[in-house]
Design a protein with these regions (language model features):
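N-terminal Rossmann-like NAD(P) cofactor-binding subdomain of oxidoreductases
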Residues: 2-252, 282-286, 358, 364-365, ...
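Charged docking surfaces used in two-component/phosphorelay signaling
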Residues: 232-411
């Protein structure tokens, strides 16, 4: 059985790992970049083609394809080099209809991303076959539907909150905690699944954890206080009523604050043990979150105050931000931003209007690092809530698993 490279404080160092087949056939394990990938329908091997890409693509499906996040999944997968979109699925009222008849397209660019005539399927593994399933379902239906796909052999990359805090489910930001994919062997063994579930965090947590990771790695975190100013797109379409949000700030988003406070610690924690003995250990610092809704279309802006070990200076914190090397460096992941964290020198940045679309919406932009008389350091962080915080995050998770050769056991 293959193991992991040792991890640093709270598991934030990048890791090399392989997950063996469930039957323990170590001879089938793949350990080098030149090795093949398991096929997607029958056990033969699809070898890498020119440029290191495999000659066959993994079959992908989108659950909840008619919603705003589902549409972003469709647009991202439309021309993906490694994944082929073969099925769109939604609720019973949409199943059986052409995609263009099941929903209105709410994104820029080509309407329905070329899939307008595809027939929408039911959210059931009996309705279609897919190697990868990208879930934009709400949490309640996700709790029943996602395990059905995982049990049948699909790998589910979920934007839903249903399984994020489960002990055997990775809550992944590829740049920060790629080693957490190692929990999948335990997940599959204990649940008896042929496939698996991998989750991405809440859209606010993605921004916060990405900003905190360099500080945890460089200094260690003692406490965090955060206030979010969250875009209306985070409420879905049609979202918050214009009568409620225009010229207003709504100081409450249901269930948002507990999600942020619990998820960040899991992401910044570490994976202990190997194989079926692996367990996730959360980072042990207190985090207080206040989440608000503001009249911005896209982009969550956070004000963050943090107490760090050793009381580093502003210059040292800025150096930690600028010097952060993500786990994904050198992997060539299709959806990875050219620059994951960018620290702005402008006193009035980041701004959603000017910064949120950077690197296809996958960049986290930081700014205004300064002393905090209460906590020690404070700064601003910004990220795209429906790309970096939703569809783009799940697709990037799948690309990481693919690059790390974790997807060898898909059917």
């Amino acid at each position: 059985m293959s193991g992991f490279r040792s991890v640093g404080r709270n598991g934030l160092q990048s890791a090399d790992f392989r997950i063996p087949f469930q039957n323990g056939d170590e001879s089938s394990a793949i350990s080098s970049p030149s090795s093949g990938f398991a096929t997607y329908s029958g056990g033969d091997v699809a070898r890498r083609g020119a440029g290191g890409r495999p000659e066959a693509k993994l079959r992908a499906a989108v659950l909840g394809a008619t919603g705003i996040v589902g549409q972003r999944f469709v647009r991202r997968l439309a021309s993906h080099p490694d994944f082929e979109l073969v099925a769109l699925a939604a609720s019973g009222r949409s199943a059986g209809k052409r995609y263009r008849d099941a929903c209105s397209w709410h994104l820029d660019g080509d309407a329905y991303a070329g899939f307008g005539d595809m027939i929408v399927q039911a959210c059931s593994p009996e309705a279609f076959e897919a190697d990868l399933v990208f879930s934009a379902l709400d949490s309640e239906p996700a709790r029943e539907i996602e395990p059905a796909f995982a049990a049948s052999g699909s790998v589910v990359f979920s934007n839903a909150s249903a399984f994020r805090m489960e002990e055997d489910v990775p809550l992944l930001i590829p740049e920060l905690n790629s080693a957490h994919l190692g929990i999948l062997e335990r997940q599959r063994a204990e649940r008896g699944w042929k496939g698996a579930i991998v989750t991405n965090p809440n859209c606010t947590t993605v921004v916060l954890a990405s900003a905190l990771a360099p500080l945890e790695r460089a200094f260690g975190i003692e406490a965090v206080m955060m206030t979010s100013m969250q875009a209306i797109s985070g409420a879905g379409y049609p979202g918050v009523s214009a009568m409620d949000i225009s010229g207003n700030v709504i100081p409450y988003i249901r269930n948002e604050e507990p999600k942020v406070e619990s998820e960040a610690g899991k992401i910044l924690g570490c994976l202990r043990g190997l194989g079926v003995e692996a367990r996730q250990e959360a980072a042990a610092f207190p985090l207080s979150a206040t989440c608000t809704r503001v009249p911005v279309v896209e982009g969550h802006t956070l004000t963050v105050s943090v107490r760090l070990r050793g009381s580093p200076s502003v210059a040292q914190v800025e150096d930690a931000f600028r010097g952060f090397i993500p786990d994904t460096a050198g992997l060539g992941l299709h959806s990875a931003p050219e620059r994951f964290l960018v620290l702005s020198d402008s006193p009035d940045r980041p701004q959603p209007k000017r910064d949120v679309e950077a690197d296809g919406g996958m960049r986290i932009t930081l700014g205004r690092v300064r002393p905090c008389p209460v906590m020690g350091i404070k700064f601003i962080a910004l990220g795209h809530n429906t790309e970096r915080g939703a569809a783009g995050a799940s697709v990037l998770n799948a690309e990481l698993a693919y690059a790390k050769e974790v997807l060898r056991w898909v059917r």
